[in-house]
């Protein structure tokens, strides 16, 4: 695709007197995985609904696969696969039947739909579950089936809303591996997620939104370096305020969340030296990550 598969320009959406999407702008490049991150109620799902033409924006412009939305949303969606936040598989059908029926929605002939099923089952690692009812599948299997179903029309763009919510770590990693294989095949992916590790592993770029506004955008590593830029020492124990006073001179920045003190350090040794052998304290020295960025930007439970 020569044009940006997804483009938002100064998009606004209001419900009654509440502005839930406020001048949101971003674009997604062909073959890119782009993440929308934000706390609950930030406007992520509303943005996806507007992208798909389900909800109409009050201002701004949206294009999907080169088509203006909402006026040409139905046409654009023929080149898009969608994985909703909650599975909407038909429980009365088998795994195979779910794929066959969905393929017919895109106008595929019966023989074309049947030819699609084996490679999709292989992709989802469900070859041995073709004749199983949906109710017999694990949560991870259902999510992979939903992803396979989103591929029946060979879409250019995939839109995924919280694709691994509710999955155990093993199922989540398998889903990530499947998504990475789609990127290798040149698919463009837009996803929302609450899992910072997921965003860091999958996304080439991401946009952090809060209260409908974009507050940061960039590659995960770039955001980590610009917003945090150092190592982190997490210290768990009583009286974090007293510890903060003691350790602040040896840190670039400190934050307290509950009973945890976060020390952001360029040189961890002075802080580590003062923590060794302390009774009643536990601490963890680690590289800065995307969760640190998210908490710093959104301010959730953190106080400077």
UniProtKB/Swiss-Prot annotation:
Which CDD domains does this entry report, sorted A to Z?
A: ABC_subfamily_A (cd03263)
Where does the record locate the signal sequence feature? none
Domain ABC transporter span(s) in chain numbering = 6-236
Gene Ontology cellular component terms for the protein in this record: plasma membrane
Query: Where is this protein found?
Result: Cell inner membrane
Q: What does the record give under GO molecular function?
A: ATP binding; ATP hydrolysis activity; transmembrane transporter activity
- Keywords from the named record: ATP-binding, Cell inner membrane, Cell membrane, Membrane, Nodulation, Nucleotide-binding, Translocase, Transport
Major location (coarse): membrane
Give me the residues that bind ATP, please. 38-45
Q: Which cysteines are joined by disulfide bonds?
A: none
* EC number from the UniProt entry: 7.6.2.-
Q: How does it sit in the membrane?
A: Peripheral membrane protein
Q: What SMART domains does the database record attribute to this sequence?
A: AAA
Stated role: Part of the ABC transporter complex NodIJ involved in the export of the nodulation factors (Nod factors), the bacterial signal molecules that induce symbiosis and subsequent nodulation induction. Nod factors are LCO (lipo-chitin oligosaccharide), a modified beta-1,4-linked N-acetylglucosamine oligosaccharide. This subunit is responsible for energy coupling to the transport system.
Q: Which family is it part of?
A: Belongs to the ABC transporter superfamily. Lipooligosaccharide exporter (TC 3.A.1.102) family.
How is the subunit organization of this protein annotated in UniProt?
The complex is composed of two ATP-binding proteins (NodI) and two transmembrane proteins (NodJ).
Q: What is this protein called?
A: Nod factor export ATP-binding protein I
């Amino acid at each position: 695709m020569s044009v940006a598969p997804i483009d938002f320009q100064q998009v606004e959406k209001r419900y009654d007197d509440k502005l839930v999407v406020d001048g949101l702008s971003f674009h997604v490049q062909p073959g890119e995985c782009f993440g929308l991150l934000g706390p609950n109620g930030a406007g992520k799902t509303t943005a996806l609904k507007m992208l798909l033409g389900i909800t109409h924006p009050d201002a701004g412009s949206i294009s999907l696969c080169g088509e203006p939305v909402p006026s040409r949303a139905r046409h654009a969606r023929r080149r898009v696969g969608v994985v909703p936040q909650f599975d909407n598989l038909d429980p009365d059908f088998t795994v195979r039947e779910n794929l066959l029926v969905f393929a017919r929605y895109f106008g595929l002939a019966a023989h074309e739909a049947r030819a699609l099923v084996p490679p999709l089952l292989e992709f989802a690692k469900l070859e041995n579950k073709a004749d199983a009812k949906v109710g017999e599948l694990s949560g991870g299997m259902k999510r992979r089936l939903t992803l396979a179903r989103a591929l029946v029309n060979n879409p250019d763009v995939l839109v995924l809303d919280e694709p691994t919510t509710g999955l155990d770590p093993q199922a989540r990693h398998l889903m990530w591996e499947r998504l990475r294989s789609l990127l290798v095949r040149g698919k463009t992916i837009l996803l929302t997620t609450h899992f910072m590790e997921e965003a860091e592993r999958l996304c080439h770029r991401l946009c952090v939104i809060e209260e409908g506004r974009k507050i940061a955008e960039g590659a995960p590593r770039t955001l980590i370096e610009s917003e945090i830029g150092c190592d982190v020492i997490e210290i768990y124990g009583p009286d974090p305020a007293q510890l903060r006073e003691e350790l602040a001179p040896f840190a670039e920045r400190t934050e307290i969340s509950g009973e945890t003190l976060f020390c952001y350090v360029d040189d961890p040794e002075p802080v580590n030296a003062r923590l060794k052998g302390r009774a009643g304290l536990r601490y963890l020295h680690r590289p800065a990550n995307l969760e640190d960025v998210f908490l710093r930007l959104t301010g959730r439970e953190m106080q400077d």
